[in-house]
Amino acid sequence: MSALSGKVQTVLGPIEPDQLGRTMTHEHLTMTFECCYFSPAPGDETVAQAPIQMKNLFWLKQNPYSSHENLLLLQETNAVREELHEYRKAGGGTIVENTTQGIARDLPCLKQLAKESGVHIIGGAGYYVDATHSEATRKMTVEKLTDIIISEVLHGADGTEIRCGVIGEIGCSWPITDSEKKVLQATAHAQTELGCPVIIHPGRNPGAPAEIVRLLQEAGGDISKTVMSHLDRTIFDNGELLEFAKMGSYLEYDLFGMETLNYAYNLEVDMPSDSQRVKALAFLVQEGYEDNIVIAHDIHTKNRLTKYGGHGYSHILKNIVPKMLKRGINQTQVDKILIDNPKRWLTFK
């Protein structure tokens, strides 16, 4: 394994795992989500093009991907800096920043935010969904993709010496594309060499997470060091959830704070409320999976920042944890979900 064995790699350099503290395993601090812009419904064009303001906040909450301005989180560095200070005051220690190639990863910005806030920030290596892959990326061999991912972890990414500490979020569509399959294979090969954590964005279908795990396994990936994101918008049947849980990955519920009537990317999905998310966590704990759960907000649009009336990065610590404690999840189990499980996942083998 690598010289990073036993360490966690942040944008400021390696640290001891015990330094992490409470960790949000899936967030974005600076990015663009324009790749996934969704045209507004007929009649909504005017509000979609309007600046973000009080009178359209509810519309934005229901249609977050139909406003170009809302998708430019990279414009809000000052607001994010303030949020990180609040996150630290609320007891937060670390944020895993999941922005990869294709959605405006900005490691120098993350490094500056880490210095100014005192929050540990971990950068992500690799590639997002096929829609963000360049033609050059699509033409690369698995070996070339592997070399790039390894280099982003060991030497630095995007022409900097700032090193990533996790591979991902690695983006997968439904159905998964050939280019995404190559990236998954490269991810598994890089993980084998580095002993590092991996985090996956699955396609929006209940069968997607299991298919991805099988592809990673076939390529030699370590599922025990892999997080499957977005389960709260992907698997809704408890039986199917338990079948997937048996495959051994970390189970991530990472859309806390996002409560919307219609989910634009899959209208068949009824986006759960935070109360339903907590209920799902309690179910998994009851079924013996407390050592596999991690949670986050996956903030990726402006309207979810407190500057715009959103819940912000401290929502879980301030509001969700008390709810968890009232719904049958004890403090030891909460600490596993927020501290112990992320620490185990993020530590290089």
Swiss-Prot record:
Subcellular location: Cytoplasm, Cytosol
Pfam families: PTE (PF02126)
Reaction(s) catalysed (UniProt annotation): N-acetyltaurine + H2O = taurine + acetate; N-propanoyltaurine + H2O = propanoate + taurine; N-acetyl-L-methionine + H2O = L-methionine + acetate; N-acetyl-L-isoleucine + H2O = L-isoleucine + acetate
Keywords, sorted A to Z: Cytoplasm, Hydrolase, Metal-binding
GO terms under cellular component: cytosol
EC number annotated for this UniProt entry: 3.1.-.-
SUPFAM superfamilies for this protein: Metallo-dependent hydrolases (SSF51556)
UniProt keyword Hydrolase present: yes
Residue numbers binding a divalent metal cation 2: 169, 201, 230
Example of a GO biological process term: taurine metabolic process
Highest rank taxon of the organism: Eukaryota
InterPro entries from the UniProt entry: Metal_Hydrolase, Phosphotriesterase
Cofactors: a divalent metal cation
Glycoprotein recorded as keyword: no
Residue sites binding a divalent metal cation 1 per the record: 26, 28, 169, 298
Comment on bound cofactor: Binds 2 divalent metal cations per subunit.
Gene Ontology terms for molecular function: N-acetyltaurine hydrolase activity; zinc ion binding
Role description: N-acetyltaurine hydrolase that catalyzes the hydrolysis of N-acetyltaurine into taurine and acetate. PTER also acts on other N-acetyl amino acids (Met, Ile, Leu, Val) and N-propionyltaurine, but at lower rates.
Family stated for the protein in its record: Belongs to the metallo-dependent hydrolases superfamily. Phosphotriesterase family.
The name this protein goes by in its record: N-acetyltaurine hydrolase
Annotated organism of origin: Salmo salar (Atlantic salmon)
